[in-house]
């Protein structure tokens, strides 16, 4: 039908745009990450439960520099609770979590972007930082970083309240990466992000030298 043909054409347009984004995103391969020391996170004998439901039982783990881990489990298994405990957003029932002094978390959560919606997009990003450092000694401006995430100059001066749901999620992701973290925590990012944004994220992560934890 005409409608299904239109959907098919639209898919190929999006796919093409995503590929272009990945090519344009090569500049991110020279990013200068915040320094990460030898001590990352040490988890010792951590317990967590909700009533009779056990989330963690004597959990031990030591994170190493550059480590990439995936967490899988059914809905309600406690994955989000676990990553929140690691970042000390939630408290464990017992045990110790020692976080290195140089660790800078970047946390993409299911809660979404919390920000004053009467701000313009560019103002919100500049409140985080003016520039994103590159290994070459140069930097990307807030406006350039926004363009990399598909916010053209006109869209950058749009009020956040006027953005679509997908654009707000993209801005949420961008705001986390622009802080230049060295330990990224991504809670089910593929649930919320569109194909072009996932293309940019994939390119970013392919050369990200820090620790990565993906649910």
Task: Indicate residue ranges for each PLM-predicted region.
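Interdomain "pre-motor" coupling segment immediately N-terminal to P-loop NTPase/helicase cores
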Residues: 3-15
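Amphipathic alpha-helical coiled-coil segments
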Residues: 18-21
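ABC ATP-binding cassette signature C-motif
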Residues: 29-215
């Amino acid at each position: 039908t005409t409608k299904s043909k239109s959907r098919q054409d639209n898919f190929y347009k999006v796919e093409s745009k995503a590929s272009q984004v990945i090519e344009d995103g090569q500049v991110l391969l020279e990013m200068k990450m915040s320094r990460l020391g030898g001590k990352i996170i040490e988890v010792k004998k951590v317990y967590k439960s909700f009533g009779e439901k056990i989330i963690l039982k004597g959990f031990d783990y030591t994170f190493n520099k550059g480590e990439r881990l995936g967490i899988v489990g059914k809905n309600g298994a406690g994955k989000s609770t676990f990553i929140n405990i690691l970042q000390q957003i939630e408290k464990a029932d017992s045990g110790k979590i020692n976080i290195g002094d140089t660790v800078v978390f970047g946390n993409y959560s299911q809660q979404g972007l919390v920000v004053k919606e009467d701000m313009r997009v560019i103002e919100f990003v500049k409140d985080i930082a003016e520039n994103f450092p590159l290994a070459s000694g140069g930097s990307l401006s807030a406006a350039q970083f926004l363009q990399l995430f598909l916010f053209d100059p006109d869209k950058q001066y749009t009020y956040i309240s006027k953005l679509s749901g997908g654009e707000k999620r993209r801005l949420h992701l961008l705001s986390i990466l622009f802080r230049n973290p060295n330990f990224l925590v991504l809670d089910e990012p593929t649930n919320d992000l569109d194909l072009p944004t996932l293309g940019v994220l994939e390119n970013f992560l392919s050369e990200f030298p820090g620790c990565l934890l993906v649910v």
